[in-house]
Amino acid sequence: LPSDATLVLDQTGKELDARL
């Protein structure tokens, strides 16, 4: 996967964790 996609997924995961 492109590094950009990895960063997007990582950021999304962090945002989801913050919502919990």
Swiss-Prot record:
It comes from Solanum tuberosum. The keyword Ribosomal protein does not apply. It is found in: Vacuole. GO terms for molecular function: serine-type endopeptidase inhibitor activity. This is Antifungal protein J. Its main location: other. It comes from the Eukaryota. Inhibitor of serine proteases chymotrypsin, pepsin and trypsin. Has strong antifungal activity against the human pathogenic fungi C.albicans TIMM 1768, S.cerevisiae KCTC 7296 and T.beigelli KCTC 7707, but lacks antifungal activity against the plant pathogenic fungi C.gloeosporioides KACC 40003, C.coccodes KACC 40803 and D.bryoniae KACC 40669. Lacks hemolytic activity against human erythrocytes. Keywords: Antimicrobial, Fungicide, Protease inhibitor, Serine protease inhibitor, Vacuole. GO terms for biological process: defense response to fungus; killing of cells of another organism.
